[in-house]
Amino acid sequence: LAKDEAEVATAIFQNVEMIEAKHRGLDVDFFSFKDWGVPDFLQLIFITSPTILEEQKEVLTRFIKVIRKSIDYISQHEEEVKSIYFNYTKQDANNPVLNEILTATLPQFVHDFSMSADYYDRLQQWLKQTGKIEKTIDPKSYWTNRIAF
């Protein structure tokens, strides 16, 4: 887009690429895939096998608890979190683009890790309709919210 070699970009993040493009002076707009029948795919999803889930349930439950505490910390200490980020990544803390991206991104972390089997069923139905997969399976065979709460 910046070199005028394309008119559209897909799978961009509104809180990253849109901000960067606007800072570059590009005339950009955003549309959500879900408004056009493509399932949303921007959730934080943790994946494991049924065996590991059974064998390590206690550890994984503690892991989710730590993630939630981290999200609390992010939301309650935004400036400190930005400082940690800039220090760790060795980025310029005065960079207005990165500051705006972080300001837009930090509130995106939420506590609700749950997803419905219906969501995954709609996703796989869309994948089948668009020829990406040949058959669908019962989402309950690969999705659980057992430790999401």
Which residue stretches match the model-derived regions?
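Pocket-lining segment of extracytoplasmic ligand-binding domains
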Residues: 2-88
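Short loop/turn and capping residues at structural boundaries
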Residues: 12, 32, 97, 138-139
